[in-house]
């Protein structure tokens, strides 16, 4: 499956993406460069959230970091230093199948 970047209007640096049917969500909090991935439905399937960016040498989209959540209480995640004017997005996938959801493109300096 090919998922690409799409232009987005300028907005606050915090960003998020949600799966349908309340299956899960992924959030970026600019203050501290914190990413949080939450499996929000007790359906036996977890979720994976992936941070992506552009490789400026090749122009290709690359996966920078992934976090999984499911089967435990609370959310998972961690820190990743999102820098300057580089475009990023997040992809959230449910382990039960179906299409992944992609966040808006965001930059730290928005």
Regions found by a protein language model. Give the residues of each.
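Post-signal peptide N-terminal regions of Sec-secreted extracellular proteins
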Residues: 11-110
């Amino acid at each position: 499956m090919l998922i690409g970047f799409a232009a987005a209007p300028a907005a606050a640096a915090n960003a998020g993406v949600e799966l349908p049917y309340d299956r899960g969500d992924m959030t970026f909090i600019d203050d501290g460069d914190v990413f949080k991935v939450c499996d929000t439905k007790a359906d036996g399937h977890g979720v994976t959230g992936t941070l992506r960016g552009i490789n400026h040498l090749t122009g290709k989209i690359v996966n920078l970091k992934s976090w999984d959540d499911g089967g435990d209480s609370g959310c998972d995640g961690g820190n990743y230093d999102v820098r300057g004017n580089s475009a990023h997005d997040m992809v959230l996938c449910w382990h039960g199948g179906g299409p992944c959801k992609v966040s808006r493109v965001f930059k730290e300096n928005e």
